[in-house]
């Protein structure tokens, strides 16, 4: 994945089979996530200085800058998403978190084949797509929201789908899929392009379906307004259960300076389906219901 000698320890760990996440807490501790289980591994770094230099190089490959004046950085590379935090006044060690992007599209039939979903759920999910009604996929971090969203969107290659993400994860293979990616401000505080800005632009791009990788802020309200005006929309949202989706929507509305009950009513009228994904042991569990 990386050919630079400074990044060899990271490349070695990422090359291991089944690794979906890799984290470092300082130079001496590393852990990998395989099949939803964490295990400690040898880091391969010999000093904090060596590790910090590797982190700076990795972030720079992603077109970002990290230093003591700006000790935090996120970067999106071809196959991984990186978040780094240099040792500074707020933390004693340099930290690195790497999420590996899925290397292939997972079809709903594959989820069914490995007993992740039932035949009835597969049929209902296809009904959600065929209805061209808007939906939200909820779940906690690492539950598989993006994986399920990718599987859903891959079911219909004839749609013109516009995806909007802060880091590229969906990576749909359809030729008529447009991928828009938000951009953080540079070290001078300039050049930021938000999810909400991209969403507004996407409304003018003749989409059959608009999808936001994850809604966290103002883009949720804009997406609900677009859906209520007839656009077919989809997104993921962090929530611990399907019952907590409404509270999460109200929380985002409040943080975005909107009246929460008003936005909750808008969500009720514009989002037709709620899909919740969770992990129980080694299996994913789905709950699909009408938003009534």
Predicted features by range, described:
Residues 38-131:
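P-loop NTP-binding catalytic core
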Residues 148:
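Hydrophobic positions on the alpha1 helix immediately C-terminal to the Walker A/P-loop
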Residues 142:
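Walker A (P-loop) phosphate-binding loop of P-loop NTPases
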Residues 137-139:
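Hydrophobic anchor at the beta1->P-loop junction of P-loop NTPases
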Residues 135, 151-269, 276-279:
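Switch/coupling sub-region of P-loop NTPases
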Residues 145:
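Conserved lysine of the Walker
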Residues 1-21, 62-69:
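Phosphate-interacting basic helix/loop segments used at nucleotide- and nucleic-acid interfaces
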Residues 268-292:
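Conserved P-loop NTPase
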């Amino acid at each position: 994945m990386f050919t630079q000698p400074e990044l060899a320890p990271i490349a070695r760990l990422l090359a291991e089979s089944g690794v979906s996440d890799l984290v470092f807490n300082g130079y001496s501790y590393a852990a990998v996530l395989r099949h939803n289980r964490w295990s400690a591994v040898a880091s391969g770094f010999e000093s904090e200085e060596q590790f910090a230099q590797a982190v700076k190089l990795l972030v720079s490959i992603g077109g970002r800058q990290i230093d003591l004046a700006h000790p935090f950085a996120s970067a999106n590379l071809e196959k991984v998403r990186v978040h780094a935090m240099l040792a500074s006044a707020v933390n004693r060690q340099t930290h690195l978190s790497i999420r590996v992007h899925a290397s292939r599209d997972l079809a709903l039939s594959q989820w069914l084949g490995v007993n992740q979903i039932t035949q009835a759920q597969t049929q209902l999910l296809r009904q959600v797509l065929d209805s061209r009604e808007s939906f939200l996929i909820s779940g906690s971090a690492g539950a598989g929201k993006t994986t399920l969203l990718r599987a859903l969107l891959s079911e219909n290659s004839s749609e013109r789908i516009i995806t909007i993400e802060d880091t590229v994860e969906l990576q749909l293979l359809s030729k008529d899929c447009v991928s828009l990616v938000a951009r953080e401000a540079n070290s001078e505080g300039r050049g930021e392009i938000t999810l909400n800005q991209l969403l507004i632009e996407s409304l003018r791009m003749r989409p059959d379906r608009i999808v936001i990788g994850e809604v966290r802020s103002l883009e949720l309200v804009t997406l609900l307004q677009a859906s209520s005006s007839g656009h077919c929309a989809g997104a993921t949202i962090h929530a611990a259960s399907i019952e907590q989706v409404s509270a999460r929507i109200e929380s985002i509305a409040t943080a975005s300076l909107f009246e929460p009950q008003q936005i909750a009513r808008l969500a009720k009228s514009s989002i037709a389906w709620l899909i919740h994904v969770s992990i129980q042991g080694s299996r994913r569990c789905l709950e699909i219901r009408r938003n009534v």
